[in-house]
Every structure is written in structure tokens, then in C-alpha cells.
Amino acid sequence: MSKPPPKPVKPGQVKVFRALYTFEPRTPDELYFEEGDIIYITDMSDTNWWKGTSKGRTGLIPSNYVAEQAESIDNPLHEAAKRGNLSWLRECLDNRVGVNGLDKAGSTALYWACHGGHKDIVEMLFTQPNIELNQQNKLGDTALHAAAWKGYADIVQLLLAKGARTDLRNIEKKLAFDMATNAACASLLKKKQGTDAVRTLSNAEDYLDDEDSD
């Protein structure tokens, strides 16, 4: 009876390491990597041999080598987003690193991309179908709060076009509009809030009209 095929790894369950030393394979199945390479571990079901990918190549790595000779990267997508490193971010996504993972502050990679003003990173993250726009971190801030506070009107515009909520308050009870540090951001947010308010009022009037017609 043949072994069942391994289950595909779920996004977010990928472990990421940076190699501290070069590893020379002894068999064709093993993965070659050099010092400084990023390794994405996708299968740890065998305690001795883990399956990993580096630079687009996939192979086996002795688990003890990874444990002893590699440095764990806890939030690679966040690191790529903070640095504005588009190629690393794309590599993380290609290797199924979870797009909505939270760091110790409760922030997403999208939050850090907006905080740093990295428009190309934001656009790349927006290509992910399950991207969470409105995640609030431990301070209650969303990606929209970060973009408004840092004064990146182009990113505020992107977030609003994607459907980011303007009515979420952080733990200081501040909306993204309250955090805006320049007129361009404030204007975009005020306009969107006004549109949303009109839409809500219109919906309420429709509801009342329906009741009247009963």
C-alpha cells in the first residue's frame, strides 16, 4: 500500500529561515543553499528530513542542520514590507507565507507597507484575494490609520478604493481622519466619510419608505 501524498501546506504554516552556513548536498534529493539564503520549510512531517525551497529550488534538508545552522525569521512578510523589498515579498507570497499574519504588535504586513509609504508593496499585497484591509493592531490602528498618520495620500487613496473602512477607531478613540497629518489625506478621508454617511442616510430612508408602504 503506497503512502498517501503529503497534504499541501496551508498559508501561514510555512517556516522561514536564513542560512548561516552553506550546505553541500550529498544526494540529488538534498537542497543546496548558501550562507544568507532564505529557506522556506514546507514539510516538517519527517523529524529527520525537512522539505524546503530556496531560490526556486526544492529539496530535503537535515532538520538538525536547520535547527543548529540557520536563523529563524518569524515574520518574513512583515520584514519585506517594512523594508520595501518587493522581490522578497513576492518570494514570500509565492512560497505561501500567510498574507494576514500578525507580528507581536498585532500588525499585518499591509500595515507596515502603509506605514513605510511603500506603494508597490501595497499594490502587490492587494493582488492576494484574501487580504484583510481592516485588521486593527494592539493600539487599534489599521493600515488606513498608518497611511493617514504618515501622510501618504496616494496610499490612503489606494486603501479607500479597495474598500478600507473609515469608521474604525483606535484605543485613543481616533479615526484615520483624526490621525491625518496633511491636507491631502484629510480631504480624501473626509470626502469618503461624507459619501458613506450619505449612503447610510439613503439606506435608512429607503428602509423607512418600505415600512410606510406596508
Swiss-Prot record:
The modification Phosphoserine is found at S202, S213. Residues 12-71 form the SH3 domain. Ubiquitously expressed. Present in osteoclasts (at protein level). It is found in: Cytoplasm. The modification Phosphothreonine is found at T200. Gene3D superfamilies: Ankyrin repeat-containing domain, SH3 Domains. The modification N-acetylserine is found at S2. One of its GO terms (molecular function) is SH3 domain binding. ANK repeats lie at residues 72-101, 105-135, 139-168. The keyword Transcription does not apply. GO terms for cellular component: extracellular region; ficolin-1-rich granule lumen; secretory granule lumen. The SH3 domain mediates interaction with SMN1. PANTHER family: OSTEOCLAST-STIMULATING FACTOR 1. Interacts with SRC and SMN1. Interacts with FASLG. This is Osteoclast-stimulating factor 1. It comes from Homo sapiens (Human). The gene is OSTF1.
